[in-house]
């Protein structure tokens, strides 16, 4: 079992972050926020996929003015992503928004930040203090020569202390870069010095394939070491893909379970069925199942018996047929043509139990 870092609680709307709460899954819309209908449609799809907090870009006044309607109709808490403009921040705070993200790399006027924090405190609005390698303060770039892990951690600690010095504690921190090792080190430095909750992720990770791998490595290592209270996988892809990858990472570390986990062998010369096709069909059909189930689909008997004992249900394939098993007990033999349908029917019954 992973021993998670002890952190203080932060609330974004009704969602608790830190203090032992389950790791919260986040994403960000890719719509124009002032297009209220498109933004709400995407938020609803993401919420259905398992997103628990959503962030929206607020680059212009028209986006800030759209927030009230979005917040009112969103099924999950909404965070406004604010850069450069304190005025946009204040407009956003009037919308009833649940949280805002501030980047000290591009809003570093302490007077304005203090005013924003005071308004957040008055309205009970949470803040994410977001430090990013691509927008680090000039003084730290001059000190370290580049956005090193130490520079990122120093920025996060400096601004955290400033937030607390003006009496604001309802915030979490994110320290992100696209370099996995830099990201891990920066978050570890910060985590050792404070109990502030951390939002973790690899920013600008890239397209779905490469980005998922980078995210799994970077996020997975931090989570294994107990660091991270909320997480986003950032991909150049449909945001719904981000949600799938997040839950797969959390499931692999036994931190949260949602939906079906498929265990299948890599295939070899012993298999006598088209296992890749079987697995593909099963995976596609089970995307909508939310119940945590472990499904084993094995190509031969070598590991099938052992996996059957660990899985909720599965197939042990042989010569153009398979044994369907449930909780390690063989149920019946099915033909290659029937195996997918029989397995799916049994899983549907389990999902309804």
Swiss-Prot record:
It catalyses: (2E)-4-hydroxy-3-methylbut-2-enyl diphosphate + oxidized [flavodoxin] + H2O + 2 H(+) = 2-C-methyl-D-erythritol 2,4-cyclic diphosphate + reduced [flavodoxin]. [4Fe-4S] cluster binds at residues 265, 268, 300, 307. Gene3D superfamilies: Dihydropteroate synthase-like (3.20.20.20), Sulfite Reductase Hemoprotein, domain 1 (3.30.413.10). Its cofactor is [4Fe-4S] cluster. Its EC number is 1.17.7.3. Binds 1 [4Fe-4S] cluster. InterPro entries: Dihydropteroate_synth-like_sf (IPR011005), Enolase-like_C_sf (IPR036849), IspG_bac (IPR016425), IspG_bac-typ (IPR004588), NO2/SO3_Rdtase_4Fe4S_sf (IPR045854). It is an enzyme of class 1 (oxidoreductase). Pfam families: GcpE. The keyword Transmembrane helix does not apply. One of its GO terms (biological process) is isopentenyl diphosphate biosynthetic process, methylerythritol 4-phosphate pathway. Belongs to the IspG family. Converts 2C-methyl-D-erythritol 2,4-cyclodiphosphate (ME-2,4cPP) into 1-hydroxy-2-methyl-2-(E)-butenyl 4-diphosphate. This is 4-hydroxy-3-methylbut-2-en-1-yl diphosphate synthase (flavodoxin). It comes from Sulfurihydrogenibium sp. (strain YO3AOP1).
């Amino acid at each position: 079992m992973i021993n998670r870092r002890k952190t203080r609680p932060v609330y974004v709307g009704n969602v608790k972050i830190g203090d032992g709460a389950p790791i919260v899954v986040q994403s960000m819309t890719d719509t124009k926020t002032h297009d209220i209908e498109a933004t709400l449609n995407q938020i609803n799809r993401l919420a259905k996929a398992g997103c628990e907090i959503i962030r929206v870009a607020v680059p212009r006044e028209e986006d800030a003015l759209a927030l009230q309607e979005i917040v009112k109709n969103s099924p999950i808490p909404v965070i406004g992503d604010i850069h450069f403009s304190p005025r946009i921040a204040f407009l956003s705070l009037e919308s009833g928004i649940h949280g805002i993200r501030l980047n000290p790399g591009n809003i570093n006027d302490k007077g304005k930040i203090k005013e924003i924090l005071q308004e957040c405190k008055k309205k009970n609005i949470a803040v994410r203090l977001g430090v990013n390698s691509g927008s680090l303060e000039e003084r730290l770039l001059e000190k370290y020569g580049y956005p090193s892990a130490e520079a990122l951690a120093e920025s996060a600690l400096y601004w955290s202390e400033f937030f607390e010095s003006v009496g604001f504690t309802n915030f979490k921190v994110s320290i992100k870069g696209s370099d996995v090792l830099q990201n891990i080190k920066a978050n570890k430095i910060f985590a050792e010095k404070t109990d502030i909750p951390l939002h973790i992720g690899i920013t600008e990770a890239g397209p779905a394939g490469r980005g998922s791998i980078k995210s799994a490595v970077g996020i997975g290592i931090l989570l294994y070491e107990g660091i991270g209270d909320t997480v986003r996988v950032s991909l150049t892809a449909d945001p719904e893909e981000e949600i799938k990858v997040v839950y797969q990472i959390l499931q692999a570390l036994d931190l949260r379970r949602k939906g079906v986990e498929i265990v299948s062998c890599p295939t070899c010369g012993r298999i006598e069925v088209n296992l890749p096709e079987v697995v593909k069909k099963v995976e596609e059909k089970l995307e909508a199942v939310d119940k945590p189930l472990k499904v084993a689909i094995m190509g031969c008997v070598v590991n099938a018996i052992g996996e059957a004992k660990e899985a909720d249900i599965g197939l042990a394939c042989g010569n153009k047929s398979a044994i369907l098993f449930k909780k390690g007990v063989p149920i019946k033999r099915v033909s290659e043509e029937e195996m997918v349908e029989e397995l799916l029917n049994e899983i549907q019954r389990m999902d309804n139990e």
